[in-house]
Amino acid sequence: MKMKFPTHPQLCLVAALAAFLLFAPACAEKPAEKTVPPQAAPPGPAKVVYAGVRSSKYGIKPFPGPAAWEKAIGAMTAYFPGSAPCGIWIVGTMARTPRFAHLEFPSGGKSFPNVEFEEADRHERYLSEFDKAGISVFLQVEPANADMGTLIDLVLGRYKHHRSVIGFGVDVEWNRTSDHPETGMAVDDATARTWEEKVKSHNPAYRLFLKHWDEKWMPPTYRGDIVFVDDSQIFPGMEPMVKEFVESWAPAFYPNLVIFQIGYNSDKPWWSKLPDPPKAIGEAIRKRVRQEIGIIWVDFSLREVLPLGEGQRP
């Protein structure tokens, strides 16, 4: 700040005296500085608690055997020391008729509105192998217009004897999709609570996950024990992806566990240039997120990135 001094002789004398009184204390010996208590350090980088892959019948063909999935999941956990091997395992997809959920196991002779089944079980032998290998899986559905409570009971009622099963997941993009095409119907607080209670009625340790690319489709305030999965794609580069994950998705659900599903072919033009893409992307996310996270690579590009032990890759 600039100061304007007077020019009249008497005023100059007054000004000089005032200046002496103002600045004299500064010339005296400084007292000992007060010790300021150290501030708490900001939260450190996140811990990757789950690392693994997503499985779907449409994402990878031919569909690998159990040993190949185990190998791919093991490669993911090796990138993130201390992480638990995990799979997002899709057991129900939206049927060709968009009001129906297609469950990939037999009906047991029963019928349910907006639900169709397969004659043979696609998943039993995989889950049995995962039990032995110590791999954890969330069983996911694309619900369409089927009743969610019914889907939870059908899926967990069939597979909860497997110790590999740790929860149930809903891809909200396909929730009531015939009425809400392209985005699915958003999940409100009451609905999220009801779904979570239904999942935990099968096992209190089970966790519900909700998946979408936009946090506005998630419950506005209810968090419970829910895991929130982001499957955003079509980014121009890694930094825009990481920025969205760490500045939008993760803080919206802090301190809940968040999982990031990565490796889409739409992002391949830039991730294919990275050394060890799962590790590079996962580490970039981990360093900038406060809560526990999971890193899941999608099956669309699995054979290009992770070893499956199937011999020469196609």
Which residues fall in each region the model found?
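Active-site cleft segment of glycoside hydrolase catalytic domains centered on the general acid/base Glu
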Residues: 151-154, 158-163, 169-204
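Catalytic domains of carbohydrate-active enzymes, especially glycoside hydrolases
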Residues: 44-97
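Substrate-binding cleft/loops of secretory-pathway carbohydrate-active enzymes
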Residues: 150-156, 214-241
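C-terminal motif of bacterial Sec signal peptides marking the signal peptidase cleavage site
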Residues: 24-26
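An active-site-proximal structural segment forming one wall of the substrate-binding cleft
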Residues: 119-130, 144-167
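Aromatic-lined carbohydrate-recognition surfaces of secreted/lumenal glycan-active proteins
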Residues: 135-149, 196, 200-218, 257-265
